[in-house]
């Protein structure tokens, strides 16, 4: 016996769909094709009825078991937009009986399609099943990295759907779903320079690639949805053939180079900092950290100081705030004093560049690139000594070169 989703909770029934003959159990691909055919022909279109009733009206019997749903890459009310390709980047359902909101080609729009609580919770379960965060035996058992029951989870399903789901009491008004659709093909540096309206200049792109080659750690800053992951992916692809790369993320998103491996923190139930330190035993040339937001900042700086540079993203409105945040995060667990952290960030052993991507001149692009200047006199609490390499000029509407590199890795050459 297994479990399936019906009437808002799990109930027991036979592993086999009731209307299928014993020798004709459909494959997951056949189930997916059947569901999408029903959806495309309008037989599956009312998401305000209970799940079992909706499926029965569509001629699908009582649906599938939880184990069968876990094998089918179908997302019910959201599936039409999941299939929309690069046009749709985000989908939101902000509570029971609320409408689906999508971001299509950069424009947010209300679809007018309402989703009842039962289908909303079904969609949450499907995302969590496909991401491997819950089991078919108990799909409503949400657990955090420490094994404790939680009411909010985020991750990636099918390597392309980055999601966040919440339920009461975390979300007191009811369940919510937010999904970001990752690109089927990650943009390259050439795409960002030439075909995306100039997200950054060729000169800036070449400098960042050369910096990675020469052991500089890059800190890529921006707000949510600003393009931090896109820029990181483009830089990774540019040096993929040259470096052994280890990527550490909450859940897998970034493209994996040929000589590389990925670590998923949520699945490992370890901390980011522990994963960073563990990767040092796996001989990386470059460590990529999906997002710095805590004590893993210290682990990244320590890794860079021992010859293991990295690329990491961070939420910040500009480059100097990003560097201050990195410094603050590195002291959070008390394992290093502010003075020690400042010493690492301004030492020749940890060449460091910060990049900010955000809205400049009315659209998304790189607007600031600065390097931290090597110095022995900088004190914690003082402004970090820095050298602006590129800055956006609002008068010319361009990213322009400011000063040459001062660090030993590029002085006199870049």
Model-derived segments and spans:
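N-terminal anchoring/assembly modules that precede and organize ATP-driven motor systems
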Residues: 2-108
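NTP-binding/hydrolysis catalytic cores, primarily Walker-type P-loop NTPases
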Residues: 66-70, 363-414
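P-loop NTP-binding catalytic core
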Residues: 100-214
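Switch/coupling sub-region of P-loop NTPases
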Residues: 216-218, 234-348, 356-357
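Residues at the beta-strand->loop junction immediately N-terminal to the Walker
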Residues: 221
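The conserved Walker
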Residues: 224
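Conserved lysine of the Walker
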Residues: 228
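Phosphate-binding/switch region of NTP-binding enzymes
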Residues: 341-379
